[in-house]
């Protein structure tokens, strides 16, 4: 594809080729100006295009900024590299230093020196006025969108990992020690508790479970004055529950109460109030208490019956032992008598008796 089909002037060489061209060769053809033309000379007819080079000769001069995703420029080294190349392009595009024939790529021999020794465009062999502005604008227009997409490395959003606080870790450890896996599901419909606590007290699921566990352990202990094995519970268990903070002597519950003072205060008071209301106004609690009492009485009756049976067996075995001892004593006496009789008999009679037996 030849560029002469689209431009009336000579084809524009790549940016890298005209930036690295020797000082004596003017590069105004890159912007469409014919070579050797001055402001007073008429424009020359379009010259024949220069022969193109190899296929991959100017491969590095292709502008691929429009095809590169801006999200790919996330490396600070790449951004610094583009920033450095941009500064070099701007420095080359600017007017060269003092000297009138400088050595820069955009210096033109024979151009008049302006104030401060700067070479002014529009000399005998230079481009028309405004060339420096056009070149600077061209380079800025070609390079600015790329750096606008890249952005400053210091302004990029940084993803900062937040470390958990010590309080959160302590809470998680305490909960993990209590319940190995305790998801927060909604309360089941068929709950054994007849009257759940109010809405402001039933919000924390853990408080509800702790109160229910404490109530269950207290319900399993009857308060009737029956023989020794089970202790009688206190008539007012709610104040003890509030003072202790959490029911149960376990170290995990104590650690949880120490880690959550607000939970300890609210849970103790709420559970005590709920239990008082249940003890006074719940028929289901009374029925359950009666069933527990009946079961305890049955178990105690069975224990008493086993004790009586054991005592009877002990008495029977004792009597048998006495009878056997008496039998042993009787047989011992008979043996001693027989031994005495045999000792009193003479030896001759014994020999005769043995001969008769033989």
Swiss-Prot record:
Keywords: Acetylation, Activator, Developmental protein, Disease variant, DNA-binding, Host-virus interaction, Isopeptide bond, Nucleus, Phosphoprotein, Transcription, Transcription regulation, Ubl conjugation. Its main location: nucleus. Changing residue 59 to A: Decreased interaction with TRIB1. Residues 128-204 are annotated as: Required to induce adipocyte differentiation. One of its GO terms (molecular function) is RNA polymerase I transcription regulatory region sequence-specific DNA binding. It is found in: Nucleus. SUPFAM superfamilies: Leucine zipper domain (SSF57959). The modification N6-acetyllysine is found at residue 161. There is a cross-link at residue 161 (Glycyl lysine isopeptide (Lys-Gly) (interchain with G-Cter in SUMO2)). Transcription factor that coordinates proliferation arrest and the differentiation of myeloid progenitors, adipocytes, hepatocytes, and cells of the lung and the placenta. Binds directly to the consensus DNA sequence 5'-T[TG]NNGNAA[TG]-3' acting as an activator on distinct target genes. During early embryogenesis, plays essential and redundant functions with CEBPB. Essential for the transition from common myeloid progenitors (CMP) to granulocyte/monocyte progenitors (GMP). Critical for the proper development of the liver and the lung. This is CCAAT/enhancer-binding protein alpha. It comes from Homo sapiens (Human).
